[in-house]
Amino acid sequence: MLEKALRGNKYYWMWLGFLGTFMAIGAICYVRQYNYGLGMTGMSRDVSWGLYISQFTYLVGVAAGGVMLVLPYYIHNYKEFGRITILGEFLAIASLVMCLMFIIVDLGQPIRAFNVMLHPTPHSMLFWDMLVLNGYLFLNLLCGWVILTAEHKEVPPPKWIYPFVYISIPFAISIHTVTAMLYCGLPGRHFWLSAIIAPRFLASAFAAGPSLIVVAALILKRISKFDAGKKAIDKMVTIILYAALTNAFFVCLEFFVAYYSNVPAHKAALNYLFFGITEHGVTYNNLVPFMYGFVILGVIAIALLSIPYTRKKNEFFLGLGCVLMFISLWLDKGVGFVLGGFVPNPLEQITEYYPTANEIMITIAVWCTGFFILSILYKIAVKVEEDIHG
C-alpha cells in the first residue's frame, strides 16, 4: 500500500515540499545545536525544560485523543466512527513520532536516551513514560496497518488483532497519565503539585486530538472523496465540547485552590502566567499574552462549537472552531503549563525563558515532520477508501 503515497497531484507534492523545506532547515539547526550544545537554547539552570518538552507534553495529549474514536467504535459498537477510526490511529502515530523527536532534540547527547532501556529504573516515571509511549506507538502501527490492509483486501480484520486494539485503549490513557505524573511528582514546583494534573491533561487531550481529526476530516472531504459523515463529525464535536468544558472547569479549580487558600507559592505561578509579577521594579510577564490567547480563543471555540448553526450547518465555522480549540489548548499546555511551572524557582527567584531562533526552527521542523508523516498516512488511507467505495 505504500505505493499509494507516491501518487498525487501537484498540490500534494507542493505541500510535502513545503514541509520538507522546513524539515531541512530544522535539521541544519539541530546539527548546530548538537555541535555547540544546549547553550544554543534559551534554557538555563532555572528553566531546564523549554519549548521542546512543552511541545512533547502537548503532543502526548494529541496522541491520546485518538482513543475517543477507538473506544466508542470497538467497545460501544458505534458504527458511525467506522470510517474515521483509522484517522485517529494514524494521528497517534505521527504525534508519538513528534514526541520522541522532541525528547531526542532536548538531550545534549541523544545516545543517552538508550540508558533508560539499558539501565531501567522502575521507580522513575521517565522509565514508565518511555515504556508506554513506545508501547502505544507500536500498538497503533500494528492495529492501524493490519486493519487498513484488511480493508484494502476487502476482508474482515483478523481476529488476533482485536486484543491489541483493546490493549491500546488503557495505553492511550496511561501515556498522558504517566506524563502528568512526571510533573505532579515534583514537590519543589507548586504549580505542578496538584492531584488534578492527570485528569486535566486527559480532558485537554480529549478536546485537542479530536479537534485536529475533525479539521483533517473536513479538509479531506474537500480535496478527496473521503467523507467522514455528518453523524460522526457531530458526535466528535460533542466529545470536544464536553472535554473542553471539563478542562476549563479544572483550570477554574486551580484558581480557586490557589486564591481561596491564599498560599503565596500556589498563587505565584498563576499570577505570573495571567497577570505578570513585578519585583524590584521589573515586571515579568512574557507569558501573559499567550494565556490571554488561551482564554479568548477557548471561549470563542466553545461558542462556535455550541451554536447549532455554526456547528451543524456551516463547515467553515465548524472547522474554525476546532482550529481555535486546538490552538487554545496548545497555548495552555504547549506553552503556559510547562514554562509557567518554573516561576518562581524554589529560591523564590524569577528567571524568564525566551526560546532562541535556532530552538524555534528545530521545533517547527519537528512539527513539519509530524505533518509530513500524517500527510503520507492519510494519503494511503484515503486512497484505500476511494478504491473500495469509489
Predicted ranges, named:
Residues 2-6, 12, 16-25, 78-80, ...:
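Long, contiguous internal "core" modules enriched in hydrophobic/ aromatic residues
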